[in-house]
Amino acid sequence: MTKLSTVDPNASVLNPQRFIQRERENCSIDIDQVNTFLESDPRSRDLTHLIVDQLVNDPIIKADSATYDQTKLTQREVTVKKIARMALYMEQDIKTVRKHFRDTDLLKSLQDFGDTTTPPLTNKDLAIFDKRLSLVANMDPQLSTRIGVHLGLFGNCIKGNGTDEQIKYWLQTRGAILIKGIYGCFAMTELGHGSNVAQLQTTATYDQESDTFIINTPDLAATKWWIGGAAHSATHTACYARLLVNGKDYGVKTFVVPLRDPSSLQLMPGIAIGDIGAKMGRDGIDNGWIQFRNVVIPREFMLSRFTKVHRNPGATPTVEVDPQLDQISGYSALLSGRVNMVMDSFRFGSKFATIATRYAVGRQQFADKPGQPEKQLIDYPLHQYRVLPQIVIPYIISPAAFSLLNFYYSTLDELYAASSKNDKRALVVVSQKLKNLFIDSASLKATNTWLVAQLIDELRQTCGGHGYSGYNAFGKGYNDWVVQCTWEGDNNILSLTSAKSILKKFVDSATKGKYNKELDKRSFRYLDPQFIRKVFTSSSENKLDDLYDYTNIWAVALLKLLRHIAKQVDSTKDLDGASKLLVLVSKFHALYVMLNTYYEKLNSPTDSYVTCPKTKEQLWNVYKLFSLYFIDKHAGEFQQFKILSPDQISQVVQPRLLKLLPEIRKECISLTDSFKWPDGMLNAPIGYYDGDIYHNYFNEVVKNNPVEKDGAGIPPYHELLANMLTRGDEFARLGGANNAEILSKLTK
């Protein structure tokens, strides 16, 4: 890094890098083993390192401090350049996968999608690029979103709702899967409706004579709103609209609607589009609004895997709907984004944990006694309580994020295989898996995006005034992040819907003994009828003696909370009246799943990849601290529902929590170094690896705000300032008195 300061770093009284270096010298854990644990396995770890190295060194993709000063227009232009670069990476990533997994000529398949001898692109083909997209989200969320809307929303909507022929046409023949030919957006949300998809108002009316659909926006509230990519770039959209045939409303279905000519980007007839304007963050995304006025599309542009319209020339057109398949469509539509947001939570959380921890170790404030050195922030007990639990949050998220991602891909592969073959028996099984996947993805997405939003802001505050600087990532990071709490399912709505499904499962298990051990063992072991009976018949108090107790206590908490809600709803017949507690069920379920997945991975002799005893001990401390921290946060509920007694909270939970903090503090630098984020990924000078906080920070500020001979330079509004400061007495009268008279009164 070019040093722009004239100050000799060796002459500084404050030398924060020496504290960082001392922490690393005293490290007792194997950060390579921890990193492998966090990245799931050695192969995933190596791929992550390779991609991260490529991203931070790519002259177009890389981020630097200049990003924080860019205007909205500049951000959008830069983002498009980065999309073009990522498209090239995509082709290379697919070639790499096929070289290892498929004996086919990739170049031929890229050029000739009509060749039926060439296998279509699959999730496996996109595996490397999907990881690349996940990692670039940590550096540039708006870039990943721009591509994610096209591939993840537009593309997955077609894959989830289209027939095999439609999938091949739109994604391969038209080139969408390779970000070629067409560029898609996802028109679900309307000005008047978001979460309540069933009440969307845009219409798609079938015209039998022309064998087309006519798309219309019936009123202002039906305007498609918040549509990423719509304002300037999308050529097509996956439009959610009400299917109207012969005057009958068949509910909301999906249609591919052309918006612009791909060659000229001119709007198609009947399309009106605008930019929705200023947002909290992610200005590189051209969010827009769309209105349709008698827009005509062919019947074949309706995605027809689950619902088909038959023209029946000379007779009345008919609509074929398979209720089971239509239900599956409802579960699969937005799963990809929710699943990926759990992984985003791990990566984004680890980024800001790294920045704040390095600052806390390097920063000094106040001394115990005059003449003594100032203490490091991290050595204050309160600061430890504020920072260290935030470090362990991404640790506990990681195994659950990878597990959920694997569950998503395997379930979707089963769905596509079963629906393509119209295998009804297989569809019954996969529909149950999809329901469980919906519960887990909704609960984990909501809980973890909330956790990371709180993490970013709390850690920003722990960095004091420097955390407020735009150059230290927290401001943009928070503004870019918090949309995750709203889009692709508002967190409260997702929490309620997942909790209602969990409540139904609980009632079925507790009253009817209904429990599918094979399907539910992954996330719902606490709903096993035998475990339910044990919890409610045992007279012994819950303890935290064994390692698994730190997970099991959340299973007990869930059951007691669910029983309370079930009794309340049975008495009041008012499920909405239990909404506050239902949101808590979703949070507790997420915490249970995360702790259970972490426990199983670390406890596995083959899957943890941790062989160093001291390293494993510290990772168990991470696990215990997470559980204790959130028990303490929910101490009121744990006492209210008699999960733990007040004495257990005050004499066991809280003392253990406080005792663990100094243990985690000893390894706080090594624990955050284990994430292995290079400076280019952090883009926050107070968190750079070398720990030279003040020089790094000062240099980035001066680089982006060059010092002139007149200091910061004469401002363009200097005349306004000068006129104010040099105004005559006639501008400064107070009650008829001049300045001299006022001054004489004040000095008497």
Swiss-Prot record:
It holds the Pfam family ACOX. InterPro entries: ACOX_C_alpha1, Acyl-CoA_ox_N, Acyl-CoA_Oxase/DH_mid-dom, Acyl-CoA_Oxase/DH_mid-dom_sf, Acyl-CoA_oxidase, Acyl-CoA_oxidase_C, AcylCo_DH-like_C, AcylCoA_DH/ox_N_sf. It catalyses: a 2,3-saturated acyl-CoA + O2 = a (2E)-enoyl-CoA + H2O2. One of its GO terms (cellular component) is peroxisomal matrix. Signal peptide: none annotated. Keywords: FAD, Fatty acid metabolism, Flavoprotein, Lipid metabolism, Oxidoreductase, Peroxisome. Its main location: other. PANTHER family: ACYL-COENZYME A OXIDASE-LIKE PROTEIN (PTHR10909:SF352), ELECTRON TRANSPORT OXIDOREDUCTASE (PTHR10909). This is Acyl-coenzyme A oxidase. It comes from Candida glabrata (strain ATCC 2001 / BCRC 20586 / JCM 3761 / NBRC 0622 / NRRL Y-65 / CBS 138) (Yeast). The gene is POX1.
